[in-house]
C-alpha cells in the first residue's frame, strides 16, 4: 500500500520538471530574490512563527489559526468543562448530604457546656490598663470570645475548626434547625386539625407547650427522632438564637 502511494507521488512529481528537477534554473541563486518567501529561511521562520500564534489566520491577520481549534479539540474542551461542572455539583450535593446527616445526629445529643471551659484564659505578667475606654474594649472582647467558645461547643465539630469555619458551619446549623422546627410546626397543624388530638404538642416560636383536647387523636409525628430528640432540637434552636 505504501509503495503504491509512493510510486504515484513520484509519477506526479515527474510531470512537474520545472519544480522538481534539481538542475532546473528555478533553484538557481538568481531566483532567490524573485521568490523570497520560498528561499529566505529567516522570513519563513518568522512567517511560520506568526501563523502558529493563537488568534492569527494566514492571509487575514485576524481570528484564530484553524489548526489550533479543530472540532475534536473544541468538543473535548466542552466535554471536560461539563464534566468538571457535574463533578462540582456532585461534590456539593454530597457535602450537603453529609452535613445534614451530621446535624441530624447532633440534635439527638444532649448539650452540656462546662462553665470552666468557656472562661477566659488567665493573663500572667500582663499590665492591664485602667483607662475607661481600654477597660470597655477589653470587656467587649472578652464577651465576644466567651460567646464564640460557647458557640464552638454548640456547633457540631466546632471545637476542631477555626473561628471563620465555625461561624460558617453555625449558619448552616441554624438554618437546619429552623427548617426542622418549621416542619414540626406544619405537622402539628396538620395532625391537630384532624378531629381532635389528645395530648398533642404545639411548637411555637417561644418553645413547646402541651395542649389537651377531646377525641382520640394521635398527636404529632416527630419525624423519626422521638419526643426527646424534638425537645433537644428545639432547645438547641433556642440556645443558638
UniProtKB/Swiss-Prot annotation:
GO terms for molecular function: DNA-binding transcription factor activity; protein dimerization activity; sequence-specific DNA binding. Its main location: nucleus. It comes from the Eukaryota. GO terms for cellular component: nucleus. Residues 128-177 form the bHLH domain. InterPro entries: bHLH_dom, HLH_DNA-bd_sf, IND-like. Flowers, especially in gynoecium. Disruption phenotype: Impaired pollen tube growth. It is found in: Nucleus. PROSITE patterns: BHLH (PS50888). Homodimer. Interacts with SPT. Interacts with BZIP30. Required for the female reproductive tract development and fertility. This is Transcription factor HEC1. The gene is HEC1.
Amino acid at each position: 500500500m505504501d509503495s503504491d502511494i509512493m510510486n504515484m507521488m513520484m509519477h506526479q512529481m515527474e510531470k512537474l520538471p520545472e519544480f522538481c528537477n534539481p538542475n532546473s534554473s528555478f533553484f538557481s541563486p538568481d531566483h532567490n530574490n524573485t521568490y523570497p518567501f520560498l528561499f529566505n529561511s529567516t522570513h519563513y521562520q518568522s512567517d511560520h512563527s506568526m501563523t502558529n500564534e493563537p488568534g492569527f489566520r494566514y492571509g487575514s491577520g485576524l481570528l484564530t489559526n484553524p489548526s489550533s481549534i479543530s472540532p475534536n479539540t473544541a468538543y473535548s474542551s466542552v466535554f471536560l468543562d461539563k464534566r468538571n461542572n457535574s463533578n462540582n455539583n456532585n461534590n456539593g450535593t454530597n457535602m450537603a448530604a453529609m452535613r445534614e446527616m451530621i446535624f441530624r445526629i447532633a440534635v439527638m445529643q444532649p448539650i452540656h457546656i462546662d462553665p470552666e471551659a468557656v472562661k477566659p484564659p488567665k493573663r500572667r505578667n500582663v499590665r492591664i490598663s485602667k483607662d475607661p475606654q481600654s477597660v470597655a474594649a477589653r470587656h467587649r472582647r472578652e464577651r465576644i470570645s466567651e460567646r464564640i467558645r460557647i458557640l464552638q461547643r454548640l456547633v457540631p465539630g466546632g471545637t476542631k475548626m477555626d473561628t471563620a469555619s465555625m461561624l460558617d458551619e453555625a449558619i448552616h446549623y441554624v438554618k437546619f434547625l429552623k427548617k426542622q422546627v418549621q416542619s414540626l410546626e406544619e405537622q402539628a397543624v396538620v395532625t391537630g386539625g384532624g378531629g381532635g388530638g389528645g395530648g398533642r404538642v404545639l411548637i411555637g416560636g417561644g418553645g413547646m407547650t402541651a395542649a389537651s383536647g377531646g377525641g382520640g387523636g394521635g398527636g404529632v409525628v416527630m419525624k423519626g427522632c422521638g419526643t426527646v430528640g424534638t425537645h433537644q432540637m428545639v432547645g438547641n434552636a433556642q440556645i443558638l438564637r
